[in-house]
A protein has these predicted regions:
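Membrane-interface helix/loop caps of multi-pass membrane proteins
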Residues: 1-364
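Extracellular/periplasmic envelope-modification machinery, especially enzymes
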Residues: 325, 355-500
Length: 500
């Protein structure tokens, strides 16, 4: 079939700036969840960008050839994403096998689901929570998002092809995509249960697809190759204003939109995705200034490495914080060390896995492996290969021999702590109902602070805590912290239950 004329594809450097903001938001959300309460929305930013760029590329290919090369599309995605993912899975599994064997439980299922881009559904099936800081310390929790994106990579090119073949009219395609995003958002609201852990709707492909497909929708409305640089000055100012307002709203959401708010699941995340769509549209327009404003060496560096940064940030935090105790005593020092480790390892991942993975020659790699085993010589190159082989074998041992259980070791330990805390909570509740007379303690006794778990309180605050009469009602999180709370607040009456 004769090729149609196609406008030259554009590289939108400003999107690296948006990627850098997104990945920094996610990292600092995991480091400071009580301060950067909406940093998790960085994932929605990645989704909108991904949906826009992939659909924009598919449209250009269709306009040029009237077909979609599915094999090339999937191979290109695998070469782009798989090497770095394999690296983080292998290295982290080897570390767990050698140094942190309490995390071996279900390792095989985690790795398999991550490699097949089904980790989000695996975590849902096993009842794992993204928001439970006490119970879920897996270094692979964040890989749920790759599952959603990977499933979209598999599904969307097929849907795109069918739409272009049978629907054809742009107007009807836009209507279909918009309806699909609304259905996904409605699923999120329908499946969300107020007061319960929102991980099911947070992880689900069905409830998160709207961010990706809003990006797809934008590519039909706002194709990058059809946008003109020479636009009226008034239009340029208007675009810049929209971009500024969208970026401001996104920044406020990053700081304040707590994932525990009902609003997030009753349309809030959908609205934020719309805000991101506006921001991506303005950055993509060559007539606006935001592409230039978000293009600088720092943003370019972070944006190009955002995938590796996202992959490595959680394993580094989990492994580091498991080995280093009392981090709160020198919080900023330990945070700096974690950031240095994250950026250092991500740089290695970017250079050795992402960059080289795109150009890897599997046949040459196979022949090199054969020659090394037949004629091993002690050189720096062979030592590197031996070290790599040791890491891979360590990972395989852990993956093959890991236990498969419906609950993880951390969940089992947590259930035991919950049982103990339940007893303490009942004692506290009964004590509060029957021993009101004990409030008449002497001033000397009330001034003696009991030995409490270090929580960065001053002596004055500890003294005040000894005298406060507090009633606390909560769920399993409060139940798990009962012992520590009663050390600080001995007169506290705690009424906590699992699943409240």
């Amino acid at each position: 079939m004769e090729k149609k004329k196609q406008n030259k594809s554009r590289y939108i450097s400003g999107l690296n700036g948006l990627r850098s903001i997104a990945v920094i938001g996610v990292i600092f959300y995991h480091l400071f969840p009580n301060q950067i309460r909406g940093g998790y929305l960085g994932v929605a930013v990645f989704y909108v960008i991904s949906g826009y760029l992939i659909t924009d590329h598919l449209r250009q290919e269709w306009q040029s050839t009237n077909k979609i090369n599915f094999k090339e599309f999937y191979l290109r995605r695998l070469k782009r994403l798989y090497p770095a993912l394999l690296a983080v899975l292998v290295v982290s599994s080897a570390y767990i096998t050698l140094f942190q064997r309490n995390l071996l439980t279900n390792l095989r299922g985690i790795v398999f689901s991550s490699l097949t881009y089904t980790n989000n559904w695996w975590q849902i099936r096993h009842g794992l929570s993204y928001f439970d800081r006490f119970n879920n310390e897996s270094p692979f929790t964040h890989l749920w998002s790759l599952g959603v994106e990977g499933q979209n990579y598999l599904l969307w090119p097929i849907v795109f092809f069918l739409l272009m073949m049978f629907v054809k009219k742009k107007k009807h395609i836009i209507q279909f995509l918009f309806a699909a995003t609304l259905i996904s958002a409605l699923f999120m609201g329908f499946l969300y249960t107020p007061g319960s852990d929102p991980s099911r709707v947070y992880y689900g492909t069905d409830t998160r697809l709207f961010s990706l497909w809003l990006g797809n929708l934008l590519a039909f409305i706002w194709p990058s190759t059809h946008l003109r640089k020479d636009i009226p000055l008034k239009a340029k100012h208007l675009l810049n204003l929209f971009g500024g307002v969208a970026l401001l709203l996104l920044g406020v959401a990053f700081l304040y939109l707590d994932a525990r708010y009902r609003f997030v699941y009753y349309g809030g995340m959908y609205l934020i995705s719309f805000v991101i769509v506006v921001l991506v549209a303005v950055i993509a327009h060559p007539g606006a200034s935001w592409d230039k404003w978000l293009t600088n060496p720092v943003f370019t560096y972070l944006g190009q490495r955002s995938y590796s940064l996202y992959l490595w940030q959680f394993p580094v935090m989990i492994f580091y914080e498991a080995k280093v105790k009392n981090i709160n005593k020198n919080l900023w020092l330990h945070t700096l060390i974690e950031l240095i480790l994250i950026f250092g390892i991500s740089e290695l991942s970017y250079r050795l896995a992402e960059q080289k993975g795109k150009k890897i020659n599997w046949h040459a790699l196979k022949m090199a492996g054969k020659s090394w085993f037949t004629k091993p010589t002690l050189t720096l190159a062979t030592l590197k290969k031996a070290a790599s082989l040791f890491v891979i074998l360590s990972a395989l041992v852990g993956i093959v021999f890991s236990k498969t259980e419906s609950t993880t070791a951390e969940q089992q330990a947590f259930q035991e702590r919950l049982a103990e805390s339940q007893k303490l909570a009942e004692q506290s509740k009964n004590q509060g109902n029957t021993n009101d007379a004990e409030k008449d303690t002497t001033k000397e006794e009330s001034k003696k602070p009991e030995s409490v778990t270090p929580v960065q309180l001053t002596e004055k605050q500890i003294l005040a805590g000894q005298t406060l009469s507090i009633t606390a009602i909560g769920d399993s999180v409060m139940l798990g912290a009962t012992a520590h709370l009663q050390e600080v607040f001995p007169k506290m009456i705690i009424d906590a239950k699992v699943g409240r």
